[in-house]
A protein has these predicted regions:
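Alpha-helical transmembrane segments of multi-pass inner-membrane proteins
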Residues: 2-14, 18-50, 68-80, 106-118, ...
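Short, hydrophobic transmembrane alpha-helix segments
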Residues: 49-64
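Non-cytosolic membrane-interface motifs at loop->transmembrane helix junctions
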Residues: 61-62, 126-135
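Transmembrane alpha-helix boundary signature
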Residues: 79-95, 114-127, 182
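Membrane-interface capping segments at transmembrane-helix boundaries
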Residues: 84-86, 336-343, 528-539
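Aromatic-rich transmembrane-lumenal/periplasmic boundary elements in polytopic membrane proteins
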Residues: 132, 173-188, 366-425
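TM-adjacent membrane-interface loops and short helices in multi-pass inner/ER membrane proteins
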Residues: 204, 396-446, 460-464
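Long, low-complexity, intrinsically disordered segments
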Residues: 549-565
Length: 565
């Protein structure tokens, strides 16, 4: 690529472009350091934390996360007090703006408090149900960590690298479990029910898939906007390792989150290099599938989790080799075009066309579901029936839970419709009222709605669900609007969005939801940091918007600490 700084309109810029053309970042404060410690605890230590048993893993995660947030609060308060005592005017002058995201977070928590006050099961609404433990206590921890991180977490370019290497041990354990091995002895200590459905140090494979979804979103976002060889290889490895983990989880909800990633990323592709990096993602996914095929074959064909769905297709389908070759060819072709014409920028019209096509496809699918579910409910659909006909069997019997949850919500009084019956009390909707029906359906017991949004609707009401959806929408919107200035904002916004999409088919719990709220808070913090940098007055004339809207050529780690390379 031609040197941007050599263009005629920018020849007046200072020679030392890394240190003089941009405002010097403010010095690190004690609050910033404390936030770094909490981020490391939440993204590296927490996913690995366990007590060696799947039966009580949720409690172990709760026992780690709650003290971590309380410690974060205490240390942040002490650090802030010391700063106020030393530089009172400087600290008080830097008041953080109150955003829509903040308002939605408070609304979400306030609804949980009100629902607890009026709940028929106040103790359960406070602590959460057995194994889930997702009551008012952990919602309070999410709220505290959100406000602390969004105010004090800055210079976050190191986060994707730490997240990448921190997740690798989790994925390695997941791979070993998938191959029928038990290196930590979890299965020997856990009951048979959990042995069948749990993997790694995360627990249920659906929870594991939600963790992988967030990881892949961060890696893909960083890969898409990478400009140099080293970060491209690094985040490419991250996508490859995450793809292997996703296959090991063998959860449809995880692939739904990945599908959301594929349809959103094209809106951020601006040139041939980024298109090449986009094509690299499915290429790495198919490559991971074939690598898993050989690993399973080397293991004698033994897998703990039966091969099914997309995992089976990626591993065993001959077409996977064809797709791998096609995607690899696209990558090479686009890189050659970028080498020939590095200054080419794709027109906005292409993104508009993609948006129209996406909206049309979404509408067509919804129309098909409505038609085959309500108008022509007897038409034979074959294998498509489990996708296009919404009934009790839809979505691995999730339809049963959704229909009953909405039926119960319709019978709520006004107060319950607004604030629900108490956080994590959904099991009282199903047990014992629908126990017999659940046994007839497939010997499956539902203690939750298997949909995060409906779960919040019936437990903390329409007010709580509105706060939750509004929080996600606000953070994602703010992140995407700033994606042109920071690839980290794009990556974190994608992580929030992918978790939100897979949450349609998953549940909130203490194994991965704390990681989600941490990434959500970091996305908000990243947006605030970008806004603060925009308000700062540079010592030299500011640089015009660069191609790819990235910072000057510098490594992510050195950028994180504001040092020139």
């Amino acid at each position: 690529m031609k040197d941007f700084y050599a263009s005629p309109q920018n020849r007046s810029l200072p020679a030392d472009r890394h240190t003089k053309a941009f405002p010097t970042p403010p010095p690190l404060t004690a609050n910033n350091v404390v936030s770094v410690l909490f981020i490391l605890a939440a993204l590296v230590v927490f996913p690995l934390w366990s007590n060696g048993r799947y039966d009580t893993l949720a409690q172990a995660k709760l026992d780690f996360f709650v003290p971590a947030v309380i410690s974060f609060l205490i240390l942040s308060a002490v650090a802030l007090l010391c700063r106020i005592l030393v530089h009172p005017k400087r600290v008080l002058r830097r008041a953080e703006p109150f955003t829509v995201s903040d308002a939605m977070m408070l609304l979400f928590f306030a609804a949980a408090v009100v629902s607890w006050q009026y709940s028929q099961w106040p103790e359960e609404a406070y602590w959460g149900s057995d194994y889930r433990h997702h009551g008012l206590v952990i919602l309070a921890m999410y709220t505290l960590s959100y406000f602390l991180l969004s105010r004090f977490a800055r210079r976050l370019n190191w986060v994707p690298v730490v997240f990448l290497f921190g997740a690798l041990p989790v994925f390695w354990l997941g791979l070993q479990n998938f191959l029928g091995k038990d290196p930590l002895g979890f299965y020997a200590k856990s009951s048979a029910h959990f042995v069948k459905t749990c993997i790694s140090t995360i627990g249920n494979w659906n929870f594991y898939a939600s963790f992988v979804c967030m990881y892949l979103a961060v890696m893909c976002g960083m890969l898409l906007k990478s400009r140099k060889t080293a970060p491209t290889l690094l985040y490419g490895f991250g996508v490859f390792s995450g793809s292997i983990a996703l296959i090991c989880g063998s959860s449809d909800s995880g692939f739904v989150g990945l599908a959301a990633l594929f349809v959103i990323l094209p809106f951020f592709i601006c040139n041939w290099r980024q298109l090449a990096h986009y094509a690299m993602i499915p290429a790495l996914l198919f490559l991971a599938g074939k690598a898993m095929h050989f690993m399973v074959a080397g293991n004698g064909g033994v897998t703990k989790i039966p091969l099914r769905g997309f995992s089976k297709m990626l591993m065993e389908s001959i077409a996977g080799w064809v797709f791998l070759a096609v995607c690899t060819g696209i990558v090479v072709f686009c890189l050659i075009l970028h080498k020939i014409k590095p200054d080419v920028s794709f027109p906005v019209a292409l993104k508009v066309i993609w948006g129209v096509v996406l909206a049309a496809c979404t509408f067509a699918v919804l129309l098909a579901v409505v038609y085959f579910s309500a108008i022509n409910a007897t038409a034979p659909l074959g294998n498509l029936e489990k996708y296009l006909r919404f009934n009790d069997h839809w979505g691995s019997t999730r339809g049963f839970a959704w229909i009953r949850a909405l039926r119960e919500y319709a019978g709520y009084d006004t107060l319950q419709k607004l604030f629900g019956t108490g956080a994590d009390t959904a099991k009282h909707l199903f047990m014992p009222k629908y126990y017999t029906a659940m046994m007839r359906l497939g010997n499956a017991v539902f203690e939750n709605v298997h949909n995060e949004y409906l779960q919040y609707l019936v437990t903390i009401g329409a007010v709580g669900m509105t706060g939750y959806i509004g929080l996600i929408a606000s953070v994602v919107t703010r992140s995407f609007r700033r994606a042109g200035k920071s690839k980290l904002a794009l990556a974190l916004g994608l992580a929030v969005l992918c978790y939100a999409v897979q949450g349609v088919f998953n549940i909130t719990q203490t194994m991965t939801t704390p990681v989600f709220f941490t990434l959500l808070a970091l996305a908000e913090a990243c947006c605030r940091g970008i806004d603060a940098a925009g308000r700062a007055k540079p010592s030299q004339p500011s640089v015009a918007k660069m191609p790819d809207a990235e910072t000057p050529a510098a490594s992510d780690i050195m950028q994180a600490f504001g040092k020139p390379v």
